[in-house]
Curated annotation (Swiss-Prot):
This is Palmitoyltransferase ZDHHC12. The DHHC domain is required for palmitoyltransferase activity. The keyword Hydrolase does not apply. Belongs to the DHHC palmitoyltransferase family.
Amino acid sequence: MAPWALLSPGVLVRTGHTVLTWGITLVLFLHDTELRQWEEQGELLLPLTFLLLVLGSLLLYLAVSLMDPGYVNVQPQPQEELKEEQTAMVPPAIPLRRCRYCLVLQPLRARHCRECRRCVRRYDHHCPWMENCVGERNHPLFVVYLALQLVVLLWGLYLAWSGLRFFQPWGQWLRSSGLLFATFLLLSLFSLVASLLLVSHLYLVASNTTTWEFISSHRIAYLRQRPSNPFDRGLTRNLAHFFCGWPSGSWETLWAEEEEEGSSPAV
């Protein structure tokens, strides 16, 4: 690997996240927080639980940021095979669209990411904090990561607050609690962002839509002339399909079924 590859945006972002995660954890252990008090009293269950949650959130972060989000295969296929696939999967009203950047036929709900330079299946968004797309393959893990990360952040926020001492002279307080207070503010900001992200993504999952579709539905060919979301199968089935892949089936098939139901005359 070339030396300059170590300075790629992905490496820098993931290294920064890892350093920040363990740096904040170290601050919570070094100051007079409940975490340190438990450790000094020999009550190691809660400190170990906190460390395991931090480690779990970090491993989930790395998994989501490094895994294939659902890239569309760029290998060329025979023309006849493409025609058969298009006929079988996509209704005539909405033919497969060829990406003008990577020249692949995009499945329904796929979109080209300019940062990754690839088309991604069930594209949600490109996450700059992970330097990776969130798509069909890693979106469920992304939601699980957000939930675990929020638990860690809120617990860390409580621990930071437990170590703050306000009734001290200004200079002494700054030396003893300045870094911990800065950590508290940072955790407050991260907790707010993680909460908003988790709530918004749970809403998207519950309605079987994506960030891109929610924001740009008026510009997306398969959504802009539909009065409702054609992929919404109800809360239970949406959650089951998102997290467990059940019931299975292509988005093209589901879209076609909804189109037939919408066009069939009322009895």
